[in-house]
Amino acid sequence: MKPNVFFENDTVVLRAPRAFTPNVLFESGQCFRFYPKNEEKTRYGGVAHGHYFEVELRGEEILFPNMTEKAFSSTFRDYFDLDFDYDACILSFPKDEYLRSAVRSCGGMRILHQEPFETLCSFILSQNNNIPRIRSLIEALCAAYGEP
């Protein structure tokens, strides 16, 4: 099922959190510019496509506080691949034990549509490194050479 999206007081709200789990997504090593904002790892802040934003899991909802409908629709709906129905995809391979095991351990993962150059740099930096070191290298590059 695709997440149900609605807008409420400068906050984007997604229902269907099973299809989107922030800590699984941001701690997976797929992206390196998001950091937990609380000890429970239910709120993350980070940069994507030149914008800082926060994502919070609250009960049955995923919140994007201080985000306009325009910013969400023009950039972040695609970034988080929200128009793809991951549940339907998962149901299409019920007999593959390897894939079922991956879904059990990484439920809520999405494929991020990241900027190609940042993805390339992240991949190069990831060789023979761990996630904390990759994050610090990417932050150093962004601070030194990124746009203000």
Locate each region found by the language model.
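HhH-family (HhH-GPD) DNA N-glycosylase catalytic core used in base-excision repair
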Residues: 1-148
